[in-house]
Amino acid sequence: MAPRKRFRLLELGSPTHSKRKVQKPLQEKTPNLRVSPLAFKIGKEIKNKEIRKTKKTESENIFNSKHVDLRLESPHPGLNFVSDAQQYSKAGDVRYLKNKSSNTLKNERQTIERPSFDNSLRFEDIEQPPKSTSTPVLSQSSQINVEREAPMFPVPYYIAPSPMYNFSPYQNFVGNPTFLTPSHNPNLNYAIPIQRPELLYPNVNVYDSPLFKKTRLPHQTKSLDKEKNYQYLPIYPVSISNNGDFVGQETPRAAPKLSKKRLSNTLDVNCSDYESSGQNATYNDSESSLN
């Protein structure tokens, strides 16, 4: 009878890791069948020894060890500007090449010297121009123009962009940006205080400016003094005058109307009372008796 096929699970390293059972690859048959089992066993032992040896050397290699000490990368003790030929011939510290326990490493770490710096160094020692007889005296080492490095941190003040080349409709010719609401102005890299709309319309009461629209609240429509109970809503977008020249939309856009079914009392918005005259935009309420 043929021997029963033995099955094993697929190994983790294989490309498709699944629970599917795969046939074990057939072992190579020994060509000489008359070899005594003892000799075969000895050969196997030798092979295992070799494998163990290679494993050991691999573990001694620093990059395979558990605790990699990166100080091995630089065998020199510290920053030495003057190159010392003998210094580079020194071998790396052998203590760290063996795979040691973290405890021993920790103890040894404290015995390592701190990097030594060469204080006797002068500027002339670092860069000397090649001395030749043809070089005039003026361009000797004392006259070398060394470029300054760029500063690490930005200067402590902002250099604001000039409004002349920076013009956008939201800035007047003088260069003062006018904001009706706090907004992000990509042209400016400095902060500007929020301006209230009443400051932009100096001649008029703020609620008479075309920025706001009277709207009655639904629960107030049936009250006795209808005129006094209204809510001020801002109208967007707001047109901004640029020195009397209107930019964008002249007639202020009305807030969206409420459906007549819900609010039968609401008047249609009539914008004819708004007069747009640059900075001095006014609102003439023809219906009110207060004028």
Swiss-Prot record:
Give the superkingdom in one word. Eukaryota
Q: Name one GO cellular component term.
A: meiotic spindle
Residue segments, region Disordered: 1-30, 116-143, 271-291
Keyword Nucleus appears in the UniProt entry? yes
Motif residue range(s): Nuclear localization signal: 3-6
**Where found, per UniProt?**
Nucleus
Q: Give the protein's recorded name.
A: Meiosis-specific protein SPO13
Which organism is this protein's natural source?
A: Saccharomyces cerevisiae (strain ATCC 204508 / S288c) (Baker's yeast)
